[in-house]
């Protein structure tokens, strides 16, 4: 029988490598278990060796080694050899009791509970204790809660503590929402340097330089005696004189005109409009965005063309992530672009049962990219998105489940401040290819013989009179306080170009002249509001015979509606076949920034 040493040598020879004499194992749960036991000791006040007293005399018994491990502040205090290192109790000034409780909870559990009421005080405590990871969590929470009412306060707070990311993100938000923010009370409390930092940027979202001037005057008048001496410097650094209208300049009071004329040696303010860069908001152009368009040379590759009708140019928007198709689309009143749901195309040419997605994305104009937001509660294809009462609603759509294709009646609500969705009362019937309109804090939903009104504040659905010619897959638009319902498919499965108008205040329907299209061209129609007027974007197909060979030709055209004449006129035709539009293409109108997009034509 071989001795143990011989067996070891035999194994080395068989394996061809020296046998290992040690084993290095890692217990993945060890750190978590240690943390749990330390938390238990803290909760039971066992083996504690330091008492921390904060504002209002509140005390906390805890462990020096835990505090020193997460905080350089405490590590220095307990190891420096100073008086505090040997004291049983230490007092911390400037930290609230709730904040200290949250810091200790974070130290012993790695978890933190943030609210709008505690986040700034906790950030302050984390700053004092030099815990950057906790500071960053607080900063991200504040960034996620930015709105026109609090962004100035957050910016000033970040500036005071020198947190670069929070300062930059809040400043970017102020510039983006400047017209809303400049009227807020906190705007008047900005320091001169903070005001200049915001106003001297190219990224300021204003359509006229006059808004910048007015905001400075508003800021000055709040504390004129102290700020008057700063006015020439603020004007010199922030106002771009060539961008001010001559008529506006002539109306400026003499004292302000004198301040504007000082520092006239600044060349950037005297070299004419051509040498003075425009603000971001001045470059915005209202464009038609076409979703679910196919690339000209490959039908499988999606592209998102943007038509600047006024300038006669074509741009390209960043396509939806994961090549999502048939998404719900919303352009908010603040020009934010959202997409939700849809499906990812299959590699199979014959697959029609697409898997619904719950993804939710917001478009970032400056970066021409899509930013992820919290996904919907329910995956859905072709849902409708509506902004109402400060929140976003996703209604209906379809999924492929169980016995096949199923329409949905569920509705959910998105709160941007909390970045979360909640379910609300479902629609009375399941719907897909329906139309939704928001008007005076109500959501109107139309499909076939169904016409409903939803009150978000009461979470209640009401019934309204159906249209005269019920039809599905029609198109709805709000124009002059009326809902225009255009085209669709009748009960006999025939397409119709009927136009009906619902007067919301009068609660009545009336007919308008039918659309001037030929059934033979198989037009696919989308309704738009462009420059305040009702338009139709139409994809029409023509069949031509050339030397006994049938050829098809598609044209994409824009028609404008004349309210008084009740007449549609073609006003634009897209460049020939830059892309292909399928049956499920969608068109929306939004203000976009050409310099942020890829130019196509």
Swiss-Prot record:
Q: Note the SS bond partners.
A: none
As one GO molecular function, the record gives: ubiquitin-like ligase-substrate adaptor activity
Q: Where in the cell is it found?
A: Cytoplasm, Cytoskeleton, Spindle; Golgi apparatus
Q: Which GO terms describe its cellular component?
A: Cul3-RING ubiquitin ligase complex; cytoplasm; Golgi apparatus; spindle
Q: Which UniProt keywords apply?
A: Cytoplasm, Cytoskeleton, Golgi apparatus, Kelch repeat, Repeat, Translation regulation, Ubl conjugation pathway
Name the source's superkingdom.
Answer: Eukaryota
One Pfam family linked to the record: BTB
PROSITE patterns named in the record: BTB
- BTB domain: residues covered: 48-116
- Start and end of every BACK domain? 151-253
Q: What does the entry give for GO biological process?
A: neural crest cell development; neural crest formation; proteasome-mediated ubiquitin-dependent protein catabolic process; protein monoubiquitination; regulation of translation
Where this protein primarily resides, as one coarse class?
cytoplasm
Question: Which residue intervals correspond to the Kelch repeats?
Answer: 336-390, 391-441, 443-481, 482-529, 542-588
InterPro entries noted in UniProt: BACK, BTB-kelch_protein, BTB/POZ_dom, BTB/POZ_KBTBD8, Kelch-typ_b-propeller, Kelch_1, SKP1/BTB/POZ_sf
The UniProt entry, under SMART domains, shows: BACK (SM00875), BTB (SM00225), Kelch (SM00612)
Its assembly, as annotated, is: Component of the BCR(KBTBD8) E3 ubiquitin ligase complex.
Which family is annotated?
Belongs to the KBTBD8 family.
This chain's function reads: Substrate-specific adapter of a BCR (BTB-CUL3-RBX1) E3 ubiquitin ligase complex that acts as a regulator of neural crest specification. The BCR(KBTBD8) complex acts by mediating monoubiquitination of target proteins.
What protein is this chain from?
Kelch repeat and BTB domain-containing protein 8
Task: Tell me the classification of the organism that encodes this protein.
Answer: Eukaryota, Metazoa, Chordata, Craniata, Vertebrata
